[in-house]
Design a protein with these regions (language model features):
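Short beta-strand segments
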Residues: 29, 103-105, 138-140, 147, ...
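Conserved, helical-rich catalytic subdomain that frames metal- and/or nucleotide-binding sites
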Residues: 62, 70, 148-245, 260-266, ...
Length: 295
């Protein structure tokens, strides 16, 4: 699947190609305040979120070339192949990247609450803006935390990111019913109910699981109202042996289940896959252990 993007301005060239892994993002908690009514961030929603990253993601490969092409591979590559405007191209323009042949192995579902598009854009910035002259908030609210790509607390409108090293990993299953959710529509539904600009707070100490259990995803009920099958996904995860928490990530529709062990997570993923052949299901680890990151 190949298309040729618009030419990019050539400021400098890299003599060798490079590869970046855009890890899937999961919001273990997501608290949302009422939209800001004045100032620089007027119209944005203040957020507070405990964010972790999976041990898989999209792989972006860049190779210097004269004109530059973009090729999508993987199970979700075909969805993006026909789109000239995508987050990767936008980030290449933002970074004023020189022409490269770019290959994207797309493993993260589209519009799924896993930050795939923003993670891809952040990977571009890591590759072509190593000195961080461009603030990652320019690629979206998830931009700064996806640029870090490590366990962190995200606050403000997403521009405040506090790394949380040393919390390790948890076993998990991610499930998406192959239904897209409109983030804008969910926020619009929330706006009629939100009154306080100050979002709730996640616990600041304890394990990843205990911190996750201390909070909620404020977008979950609103997303379910629009896409009821999300509730079926949550039920399937919650009923699986060893599941300690089932919750939606981001604005959905992907949900995660936290399990006591990798073995229980794998068993749950296999059972859900067999029961729901049309769903995307993946057992993984969430959190930071670089040696376990796979592509």
């Amino acid at each position: 699947m190949l298309f040729r993007p618009k030419p990019t301005p050539c400021l400098k060239d890299m003599t060798e190609g490079r590869t970046e892994l855009a890890r899937a993002k999961v919001n273990l908690t997501l608290h949302v305040g009422a939209s800001i009514q004045s100032g620089k961030w007027r119209g944005y929603h203040p957020l507070e979120s405990l964010v972790v990253f999976a041990n898989f993601g999209d792989t972006l490969s860049f190779k210097p070339s004269r004109n530059g092409t973009m090729e999508f591979e993987g199970p979700f590559g075909e969805v993006l192949c026909d789109q000239e405007n995508n987050s990767i191209w936008d980030a290449l323009e933002l970074a004023k990247a020189p022409p490269h042949d770019t290959t994207i192995d797309k493993q993260i579902p589209i519009a799924a609450g896993l930050g795939g598009g923003t993670a891809d854009a952040a990977a571009v910035l890591r590759a072509f803006d190593p000195n961080r002259k461009i603030h990652p908030i320019k690629i979206g609210a998830d931009g700064p935390v996806c640029h870090l790509s490590r366990t962190a607390m995200m606050e403000g409108i997403g521009e405040v990111v506090s790394p949380l090293p040393g919390l390790g990993q948890i076993s998990a299953v991610l499930v998406n019913p192959n239904v897209a959710v409109s983030t804008g529509a969910v926020f619009n539904a929330m706006d009629s109910r939100l009154r306080d600009e100050n979002p709730a707070m996640t616990a600041r100490d304890g394990s990843l699981l205990s911190r996750a259990l201390s909070g909620t995803n404020d977008m979950q009920d609103f997303a379910i109202a629009q896409v009821p099958i999300i509730n079926d996904v949550l039920r399937a995860l919650a009923q699986a042996t060893g599941c300690e928490l089932a919750r939606m990530s981001g604005s959905g529709a992907t949900c995660f289940g936290i399990f006591r062990s990798d073995a229980q997570a794998t068993a749950a993923a296999n059972a859900i896959s067999q029961a729901q052949e049309g769903w995307w299901v993946r057992a993984c680890r969430l959190g930071d252990d670089v040696q376990d990151i796979v592509t």
